Each structure stands twice: as C-alpha cells, then as structure tokens.
Regions:
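Extracytoplasmic cell-surface/polysaccharide-interacting catalytic and binding patches
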Residues: 1-69, 73-136
Length: 136
C-alpha cells in the first residue's frame, strides 16, 4: 500500500508521502472550528465519518470542535520545527509527526477539542470525555 489515496496507507517515519501530495477530495467538515482559521478540511470519507461522530457526541452532551485538520507538508514542517525549538528533539519526535509522514497531510487526521474547553468549563478535553463516559 504505497498509494496516498488509499485509506490504509502506511504512513510513519520511513514511510513518506511526497511533499507535493494534496488529497483530491478535500471538503470542509461541517462542525465547529476552535480557532476560526478555516482549518476544517478533510478527505470526504473522513469528513463524513467525523460529522456522524459529532452528531452522536452531541446527543451525549459533548460539543466537539476541530483544532486542526488537513495540513500540507509545509505547514507540518512549521509545526515540527516549532516543537523542536520549544520542547527539544526528544519530546518533539513523540508529539509531532515528521513532515511527509503525517496523516494530517493525507486529510485523514483531525485534532479535536470541545466547546467546554474553549469556554473554560474544562481545562482539558479528556476531563470532559471521562465525565461523559462515566454517566453513560
């Protein structure tokens, strides 16, 4: 599986996609975006699945929001470099994918938060998720 269009593509350190790869079917996900920066693009199949998950989560009282979705190679490079400078190599390589081996570049990955984190009700996303799961 070396075709970037394939949903089961192996992408990690050592398995890279070209710098110029951009998914053909990027679409705007119809859920809130935390930073209002327009970073809500995903491949259509992933966007559809996320929208379905959003609706299910909303029924449970969780209002999800996108922190970051599709990232082109050059943007992933910026994030990677910032983490290297801020946190050092040992931490950065654990937290951020190398440019060219990020599922964000494939349009299949999304970083989520919630409305309650954005408005300050919860400090971190996991606190709200743990509470929601415990009441199910």
């Amino acid at each position: 599986l070396d075709d970037p269009k394939h949903l089961l593509l192996m992408i990690k350190r050592g398995f890279y996609v070209p710098k110029t790869y951009v998914p053909e079917n990027l679409t705007a996900v119809q859920i809130p975006v935390a930073h209002n920066d327009g970073n809500n693009l995903m491949r259509k199949d992933a966007a559809d699945a996320l929208e379905s998950m959003y609706k299910d989560a909303k029924k449970q009282g969780l209002i999800l929001a996108i922190n970051s979705a599709y990232r082109p190679y050059n943007e992933q490079q910026q994030v990677y470099d910032e983490y290297m400078v801020t946190y050092g190599v040992q931490t950065a390589v654990k937290l951020v994918a190398e440019p060219g081996c990020s599922e964000h570049q494939l349009g299949l990955s999304v970083d989520l938060t919630s409305q309650s984190v954005m408005d300050g009700t919860y400090a971190v996303f996991g606190q709200q998720m743990n509470r929601a799961i415990s009441v199910m």
